[in-house]
From Swiss-Prot:
GO cellular component: cytosol
Keyword Glycoprotein (UniProt): no
Entry cofactors: [4Fe-4S] cluster
Residue span(s) of domain Radical SAM core: 146-374
Annotated protein name in UniProt: tRNA-2-methylthio-N(6)-dimethylallyladenosine synthase
InterPro entries: Elp3/MiaA/NifB-like_rSAM, Methylthiotransferase, Methylthiotransferase_CS, Methylthiotransferase_N, Methylthiotransferase_N_sf, MiaB_methiolase, rSAM, rSAM_horseshoe
Localization terms from the record: Cytoplasm
Keywords attached to this entry: 4Fe-4S, Cytoplasm, Iron, Iron-sulfur, Metal-binding, S-adenosyl-L-methionine, Transferase, tRNA processing
Organism of derivation: Paramagnetospirillum magneticum (strain ATCC 700264 / AMB-1)
Keyword hit for Glycoprotein: no
Amino acid sequence: MAKRLFVKTYGCQMNVYDSARMADVLAPLGYGPADHAEEADMVILNTCHIREKAAEKVFSELGRLRKLQAAKAEAGGRMILAVAGCVAQAEGEEILRRAPFVDIVLGPQTYHRLPEMVAQAARAGGAVLDTEFPAEPKFDFLPEPHAEGTSAFLSVQEGCDKFCTFCVVPYTRGAEYSRPAAAVLAEAATLAAGGVREITLLGQNVNGWHGGEGWGLGRLIRALAEVEGVERIRYTTSHPRDMDDELIRAHAELPQLMPFLHLPVQSGSDRILAAMNRGHDRDTYLRLVDKLKSACPDLALSSDFIVGFPGESDADFEASMDLIRRVGFVQTYSFKYSPRPGTPAAAMETQVPEAVKDERLAQVQALLLDQTMRFNHACVGREMRILLDRPGRHAGQLLGRSPYMQPVHVKAAAHLIGTVVPLRITKVHPNSLEAVPA
């Protein structure tokens, strides 16, 4: 009898990729997808540890799942509960202490061993904890990816050696590791053969990817652009310190590389950037932005900002607001600083009051909303090539994404799903654009 798997994903795009690969790993055991946890024989929570609230959400969800697990047992069945990802890596033993009904706890580098963990949990009847950083890369043991839809994530780099003072990633994802170019290109070819037209390369420091013998991310993207069927390429998340001339030239020369770049800066204050151990200052970032926009005049930028970092003064915060205006970010992910246990910033004495964080976050988000809407309105009348990837909400409507990641609605025939078509933007909605055939 077929078994059903439900995976709930928290956090970043890397977790989305990992969740899909966990499903691939478990498919040979007979697990097919479930739409809801209530239908599942196995539930995996793939977790994020970036902020405190994200971790607490996991424990809250486990409380709900415990009831489903008990109901399944009363009906004579079994629901395997697994916690994966960065919370599992950082707090594996705490998870088993607070939620002893969990069957499997595994880190982000060990999910290729899930079949063995499932078998071990069934044999022993107790919890399995696997949060090692194995010497062998997990990618060497994963099956071919299962392509669904017209867009896909492709992990090329994991881990981080930057050790920003606020961040847990070096501790939960481990040291930086780059997948071999041949493996990346083979996976891209498999995805394209399955109908994928847009590939987003993923990494904690994706532009730090290196393949030896002169291979950097720019060269990898050039090779990826030669893969038959790949029409659009993106990459995230990049670090300003790893943005080299070869990659910038790729933005200038490759039409497949979308003119939208997520380049996190976190703060516009030199003092705070130094306290964060970001390894660059404000002017270095601005010079990099100028260089990128000179190479690719149509380029639009997004970023991450942390407000209320320990010691952030009103002047520091205003420097961030000024940087947002100067760069003209069309999108940002902005967050209140959240102390993460074990990081240097958590031990800093000058913590900012929550009320101040709330006010600053509201100001940043209001400014960014204004800039986003200005950018969207500036798109009206422009012709763009849109990848149509699904039916829209209304009959006869399709939904796609612009080169700048904006959702775009158009009246079009269903057979155009999976194609890149020229459209003219005609109208701005609060969360999307409207278009007609160009």
